[in-house]
């Protein structure tokens, strides 16, 4: 099944639902960063959460940054997701492994530890909206749901899942169901929705059982006036890094530092944290940057 995002509404627009399949992009992240099992689960859940949150933004080019900063051995998570369906991310310690938790599952909460969730929404106006909440469990799903209720005052049910086997990621994705103000006053409706979401064993078991996103929507909201939008959105792991950007960053170091790199290292190497791509800048590249800096200095002087 292709990585995709599908939207739906129910209860005359009082319920908003978004589902994502992120199996392939999570596997790509695992391979790029050489992630351990628990690191794959942690990053995969956070990427799915980022895409779900970004899906509610309106302006073209809008993006959301999700940073999980805990005191656990994973050493943090950073994800950048866009309304356009692109996502990238990394963890501080990609190779960490822990014993299973009390439920026999990957111990994402133990890897993350105690700390905070930071969310920055950039809607393209130059004034990003940021918010911080304390982590509830470190399992990502609970933490993002807590953020949505606390910071956006929107009752939300969020399921995230990543299944990692010996051959890699075989199922990953998530589901976000939000009760909007027009339906929040219907206590019976809210109770029914909470009961159904609570009865689910998780998101990845549904995918492993062969369920599609429309089928999952029907199971949850089929008798609540469900409308599934026919357009699905393709999702993919994508990083906007480039050699030109690397040169721009190196140029900011200044002449003395660049000259030192030429003498000591015969060039420079840079690795993108988000995608793991390695860039090599030769001594000739660095020499040209020095020339550019000298030219700019003489012009401005």
Curated annotation (Swiss-Prot):
Subcellular localization(s) per the UniProt record: Cytoplasm
Disulfide bridge partners, by residue number: 239-241, 272-275
Superkingdom of origin: Bacteria
GO molecular-function terms, A-Z: protein folding chaperone; unfolded protein binding
Keyword Transcription regulation in annotation: no
Stated family: Belongs to the HSP33 family.
Listed GO CC annotations: cytoplasm
Post-translational modification: Under oxidizing conditions two disulfide bonds are formed involving the reactive cysteines. Under reducing conditions zinc is bound to the reactive cysteines and the protein is inactive.
Organism expressing this protein natively: Nostoc sp. (strain PCC 7120 / SAG 25.82 / UTEX 2576)
CDD domains: Hsp33
GO biological process entries: protein refolding
Matching HAMAP family: HslO
Keywords carried by this UniProt record: Chaperone, Cytoplasm, Disulfide bond, Redox-active center, Zinc
Function: Redox regulated molecular chaperone. Protects both thermally unfolding and oxidatively damaged proteins from irreversible aggregation. Plays an important role in the bacterial defense system toward oxidative stress.
Protein name: 33 kDa chaperonin
InterPro entries assigned to the protein according to its UniProt record, in alphabetical order: Heat_shock_Hsp33 (IPR000397), Heat_shock_Hsp33_C (IPR016154), Heat_shock_Hsp33_N (IPR016153)
Major localization class: cytoplasm
């Amino acid at each position: 099944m292709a990585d995709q995002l599908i939207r739906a509404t129910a209860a005359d627009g009082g319920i908003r639902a978004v589902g994502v399949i992120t199996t392939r992009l999570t596997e790509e992240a695992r391979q790029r960063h050489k992630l351990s099992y628990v690191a794959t689960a942690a990053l995969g859940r956070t990427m799915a959460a980022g895409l779900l949150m970004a899906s509610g933004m309106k302006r073209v080019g809008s993006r959301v940054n999700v940073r999980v900063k805990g005191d656990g051995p994973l050493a943090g998570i950073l994800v950048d997701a866009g309304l356009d369906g692109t996502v990238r991310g990394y963890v501080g310690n990609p190779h960490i492994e822990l014993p299973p938790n009390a439920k026999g599952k990957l111990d994402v909460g133990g890897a993350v530890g105690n700390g905070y969730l930071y969310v920055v929404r950039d809607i393209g106006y130059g004034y990003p909206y940021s918010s911080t909440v304390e982590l509830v469990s470190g399992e990502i799903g609970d933490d993002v749901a807590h953020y949505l209720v606390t910071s956006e005052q929107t009752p939300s049910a969020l399921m995230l899942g990543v299944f990692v086997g010996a051959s890699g990621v075989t199922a990953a994705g998530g589901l976000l169901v939000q009760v909007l103000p027009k339906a929040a006053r219907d206590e019976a409706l809210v109770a029914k929705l909470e009961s159904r979401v609570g009865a689910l064993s998780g998101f990845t078991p549904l995918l492993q059982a062969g369920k599609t996103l429309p089928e999952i929507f029907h199971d949850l909201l089929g008798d609540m006036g469900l409308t599934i939008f026919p357009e699905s959105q393709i999702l993919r792991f994508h990083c906007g890094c480039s050699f030109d950007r690397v040169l721009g960053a190196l140029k900011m170091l200044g002449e003395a530092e660049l000259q030192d790199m030429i003498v000591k290292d015969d060039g420079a190497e840079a690795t993108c944290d988000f995608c793991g791509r390695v860039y090599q800048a030769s001594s000739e590249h660095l020499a040209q940057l020095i020339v550019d800096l000298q030219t700019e200095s003489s012009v401005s002087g």
